[in-house]
Amino acid sequence: IDRSFSVSGFGTVVTGTVLGGTLRRDDTVYLQGINPKPLRVRRLECYGAEVAAIQAGDRAALNLAGLDRTDVQRGLVLADRILRATSLVDATLALHAPETELGIWSQAVFLAGTAERQVRVHLLDRNRLGTGETALVQLHLQEPLPLQPGDRFVVRNSSCDVTLGGGQVLDASPLHHRRRPVRLIESLTRLIGSPLPELVALELRRARRPLTAKEIAANLNLDQEEVARAVASSPAKTLVPFDTKEGLVLVSRSYLDNLGRLLVA
């Protein structure tokens, strides 16, 4: 969302850019982080003309039933479900500003969409990041944001007058990396390019137990259909699905192999 206003006889209108998916008139959306109640889409406009649906890439205006103008601020996100906000993100960061160098810890400003947050940048795979280089980083946001794997962002200097570079979110629900072991770097490197099966496998390794597709979707800010597609495309059956009364349950192949060895022993 980049703007909001009230129209007599219609109520609150918000404008912004559609980042993904499709939205239709009478669909239900949620304002992330502020208003958890469902909001109905009364009317949609795209480039000034009323339309029945909007999709990724469109500039759009939404007239929302049940939303008070005072609840809206620039940088908020509308989605078809309630997303998990995070203040800790693993990402890639490419530094483009000339004659600039970042140390292992640096203060900066993080911008994603129209949202802006103060951030501490922690380099994971090196001690210095220079102009023209790309690093694996963990970003510590001062205030949480609803972010997803694959989201792109820009980083500016702490006074927000120079753009330092940009990057892409790899993992929006990581552990706090106090150390930088080789296995962490290898795991994050496998996430570059947003391979969804690897991200789901990482979530299962962190949990050290089977997880439902619903749990994984909630943790990663995905929908359950995306999790199901990850299972279908996982290489060499690394993700093993089970249909249960609670729905789809996923187990990593390594978890099953370890369990089998324990039972045999």
Locations of the language-model features?
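C-terminal effector modules of nucleic-acid-centric enzymes and ribosome-associated factors
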Residues: 47-52, 66-265
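Conserved catalytic-core segments of large NTP-driven translation/proteostasis enzymes
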Residues: 1-99
